[in-house]
Amino acid sequence: MKWVESIFLIFLLNFTESRTLHRNEYGIASILDSYQCTAEINLTDLATIFFAQFVQEATYKEVSKMVKDALTAIEKPTGDEQSAGCLENQLPAFLEELCREKEILEKYGHSDCCSQSEEGRHNCFLAHKKPTPASIPFFQVPEPVTSCEAYEEDRETFMNKFIYEIARRHPFLYAPTILLWAARYDKIIPSCCKAENAVECFQTKAATVTKELRESSLLNQHACAVMKNFGTRTFQAITVTKLSQKFTKVNFTEIQKLVLDVAHVHEHCCRGDVLDCLQDGEKIMSYICSQQDTLSNKITECCKLTTLERGQCIIHAENDEKPEGLSPNLNRFLGDRDFNQFSSGEKNIFLASFVHEYSRRHPQLAVSVILRVAKGYQELLEKCFQTENPLECQDKGEEELQKYIQESQALAKRSCGLFQKLGEYYLQNAFLVAYTKKAPQLTSSELMAITRKMAATAATCCQLSEDKLLACGEGAADIIIGHLCIRHETTPVNPGVGQCCTSSYANRRPCFSSLVVDETYVPPAFSDDKFIFHKDLCQAQGVALQTMKQEFLINLVKQKPQITEEQLEAVIADFSGLLEKCCQGQEQEVCFAEEGQKLISKTRAALGV
């Protein structure tokens, strides 16, 4: 059973069961009930995002037809209604339009959804979303001459097509983020069309946009996967921690209010409710900016930006400084009160306030580390109040909570030490060996992609100051592991990976760190084909040569996951000797055929395969 179902997180679920319950039980009104929308809404672009994300293979013409029909079916609000507040949620109308398009749904394999009830139908369409559909090619930067002409002739249609292309390639990317990057792309085009070297301008500036889009898409998909697999409670626990770290001067009641509404917005965004995702996000940002004097002095410049720009700016803004007079630790936070005598509601509030107070004191820690500390603290209290001396038990136990931080620090020190010693490429090779042993069922390209990100994380985070290193490393590892878990959900890897992915969000990374070798894996029969070497090894350079060497490394470990470090070093030394000998000779292909076979025989004998 997931630890997030413990009392520690029940209070968070209570916040989101309904806005009425939240307001009645805690006396806190939701921001989303009171704030008005301030920005003009382009329903055509929003509807385009919706239909392109839900039927990714549909052509632009097909999506445009669905958009037109859906918007025609929606009653236009009067001027008074429009100015008085926000548009109503149009999700049901969009889903109805999807189901009216029987030919399109049949064509792309979505027709099974419309026979279900409203909620089931929605979930069915969500399940059809694919992060990287094979039928859709990577986005290519448009040819400048044609693009500039099309943009000048009909800017609105040109930008709507761009939104369509982005949405279908990134089905989990939040609508406001798509609109934000579309707006930035809209600014790039006129300047690049006038540039002396338009091709270079487009390639350079558009490459930045597409890179940021990919990264934003990964983050949004990760957030949605956490909410789906671990529930709203876990997501809200994450949000409590992040907001308390960012807004260190804010009291617990205000954090509660923000947690409710931030999680509510993410839920809309993850379910493809494009209108509520946009409007409710705007409300929260408007509220935060209206309260910036009390929330944080780090967001002043953010609040001067457009509504779309504010969100990204605030999210990436620095944490506020710790308030003066804040005690360095939370020793005896409970005091002499008997935790086991608390009512369920009292326990909820107390533990929530502990998370808030701990987070604002430790902005340098990763969210997952703080959640591990919080779980440990709950278990400590439950244990101590069954002893004769609860206070003494607490004092000893609170020192033990440091083990969660120390484990994270030790991992960071070890990883950065290896990075300094080996460099990024050889560190990736070390990760390759470790993760091929943990998950030999992954393809070579998957293993290389995962470990490349891990090595890049070390290269980035190990350059940071100590107060930023831990959060950087653990945070990046959480995203990388999260996407491995999304892959496992689609195509199961092995029981060990499955256990780590599903048992506990907070403990996912330590769980993966503790995996060594997948004992359920049965290596395939030895095949010489995977170890045949050719003269192209001598011709390859840079990344191409590194990739070939890594393929050899992966195949070797997959053949014998229990291979020792000494055995591995010996085989690699022999392989390097083979390259040196054959690449210096005239008859390279003959050399590889003869000497390569000797290497294979020697390796098989040494490994017993």
From Swiss-Prot:
User: Quick one: where is this thing mainly located?
Assistant: secreted
The chain residues annotated with the modification Phosphoserine are 111, 115, 117, 344, 444
Query: Which keywords does this chain's UniProt record carry?
Result: Copper, Disulfide bond, Glycoprotein, Metal-binding, Nickel, Phosphoprotein, Repeat, Secreted, Signal, Sulfation
Q: Which GO terms describe its molecular function?
A: metal ion binding
Cellular localization per UniProt: Secreted
Q: Does the keyword Signal apply?
A: yes
Residues carrying covalently attached carbohydrate according to the record: 42, 251
Disulfide-bonded cysteines: 99-114, 113-124, 148-193, 192-201, 224-270, 269-277, 289-303, 302-313, 384-393, 416-462, 461-472, 485-501, 500-511, 538-583, 582-591
List the SMART domains hit by this protein, alphabetically: ALBUMIN
How far does the signal peptide extend, from start to end residue?
Answer: 1-18
- Where does the Albumin domain lie? 19-210, 211-402, 403-601
Q: What's an example GO cellular component term for this entry?
A: cytoplasm
Q: In which tissues is it expressed?
A: Plasma. Synthesized by the fetal liver and yolk sac.
The entry's Cu(2+)-binding residues are: 22
Known partners and oligomeric status: Dimeric and trimeric forms have been found in addition to the monomeric form.
| Protein purpose | Binds copper, nickel, and fatty acids as well as, and bilirubin less well than, serum albumin.
So what family is this one in? Answer: Belongs to the ALB/AFP/VDB family.
Q: Provide the protein name.
A: Alpha-fetoprotein
Q: List the gene name.
A: AFP
